[in-house]
Design a protein with these regions (language model features):
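Active-site neighborhoods and metal-handling regions in enzymes and metal-associated proteins
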Residues: 1-155
């Protein structure tokens, strides 16, 4: 909803980790400044309260989405995309919002185990990859398009 803060939404990103008694000790995301300040308010996704950080997400705000997990002595992974905050449905419950990915690069399919993904997870990844190909391919030559097609294939 339009009245949501990043702190409210942060728990949604953490839920799959918390369900497995895991956590990441960094923010889920942060605002990106128009002068390219990488950590710029007023909005962000954090699980720890910071005084004065009550800014609601508004249309046009660019926010990063960067959950990750680090297993000491083993491995770590962190995905980071930039998202544009957009207005969605307006109804009797309020103005709903959604995020549009604006960082359009393929996810490394060799590092993904589709056997542990839900159908919804697969659909999200496949839809994202279809958008990556659709938007980026027209700017590439034929050889580059073939490379992109391989790395944005459906799973």
């Amino acid at each position: 909803l339009e009245v949501s803060t990043g702190m409210i939404l942060d728990i949604l990103a953490r839920k799959p980790f918390w369900d497995r008694d895991l956590n990441f000790n960094h923010g889920t995301g942060h605002g990106v400044g128009y002068l390219l300040n990488i950590h710029e308010g007023p909005a962000g996704f954090r699980w720890k309260y910071r005084k004065g950080e009550t800014e609601v997400l508004q249309e046009g705000m660019v926010i990063t989405d960067e959950p990750g997990i680090y297993i000491e002595g083993s491995h770590g992974i962190r995905l980071e995309n930039e998202l544009l905050t957009c207005k969605g449905t307006l109804n009797e419950y309020g103005q709903f919002m959604y995020f549009e990915a604006i960082t359009l690069i393929p996810m490394d399919l060799d590092a993904i185990n589709p056997d542990i993904m839900t159908q919804e997870d697969k659909k999200l990844l496949n839809d994202y990859h279809a958008k990556v190909y659709e938007v980026i391919a027209p700017y590439l030559n034929e050889e580059e398009q073939e490379w992109l097609k391989k790395y944005t294939r459906a799973i």
